[in-house]
Amino acid sequence: DARSMSLETWELLSYVVTAVGLPLAIIVFLYEQKRERDNEEEEVYQLLSDNYQDFLKVALDNPDLRLFSAEQTPDLTKEQRERKIIIFNMLISLFERAYLLLYEPKMSPQQARRWSSWADYMREWCRREDFRALLPVLLEGEDAEFVSYIRTLAGSKSARQPAPEQAAAR
């Protein structure tokens, strides 16, 4: 009789382990999957940020183009115009990559925070008159949704107004 009781006890314990352990294992699995996704998203964001830093170095290496000025640089030589178009193409390519990898119609607060920094970069560059003027050429062959996004951004009032620091410098 003691033997059958221990068998019943073991059977009951196995049901309890199954009833508790399986849902717990699923929860742990889902948590690990989310954490892995978050880490991958953070890695993508970091790589894009590093690429933007590299772009800024290229812009700094070309001071004659005055790429950090809000106004269009006047009287550029043919070679300078060509360099500027190449640099702006690099920037559009980076913006498109950021859009394709980071933008989602519905984002978590963390995703929205990451995306907002890129939206700010895009808005900042769209404030440049010469950048906006070159957009039709720069956007040829780019992703249609990205093209629509950047055109909307470039056409917005905030893109046409100088940034606060630019307005203060005047």
Could you say what each language-model-derived stretch is?
Residues 5-19:
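Feature marks short, highly hydrophobic, charge-poor N-terminal signal-anchor/signal peptide-like helices
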